[in-house]
Amino acid sequence: ARGICLRARGTAGRLHACYKLAQNVMEYSSGIATRTAEMSAAARAVNPAVHVAVTRKHFPGAKALSLKAALAGGASLHRLGLSDSILAFDQHRIFADDFIALIPKMAAAFPEKKIEAEAESPEEAMGYLRAGIDMVQCERFAPAELAAFVKEAKAEFPRAVIAAAGGINAANAAEYAATGVDVLVTSWVYFGKPEDIKMKFSRA
């Protein structure tokens, strides 16, 4: 779209001191928002209920801008930090003798927190659901494998939240959304070409 998105007035010296920073911030943020919007549109075209959720894997120091840009593009936030939910990856579970047994204990200890775990197979994911986990994140499942798992899991646990993660982007978002998952988890939107925003000086 063409049009003015930002206008500033000031002395020549002050304008030159800040315009390039403003232009760069807007270009990078707009790139994130555009990629997010494209991915969300592709996913919701086949599954209107699906959410695109962005991770914390943004460029260090750019959290606020990255997350606001993703929100502007129509995404939700997977997590803001380590304290807003419990998410167990393999690098956490390796230190537990019996992670399955920990799930009900975590639920009892933190009743206000959602408990989520990453799974690398349908069998592992189903085991977590049967132990009472709130959300399972299916890591790099093939679409056909994921669709079969979603059907089985929702039949037994209709309130469970199922997320797909690992390599999901605008090109394959529709295919993964069509499996019936609730959430597509991605960091793809952060990495790509900035938008091209032109700037022009004029004298008052």
Regions of interest found by a model, annotated:
Residues 195-203:
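Structured adenosyl-cofactor binding patch, chiefly the S-adenosyl-L-methionine
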Residues 1-120, 124-131, 135, 147, ...:
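Acidic/glycine-rich phosphate/pyrophosphate-binding loops and surrounding catalytic core
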Residues 155-161, 203-204:
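Short acidic, glycine/proline-enriched helix-loop-strand junctions
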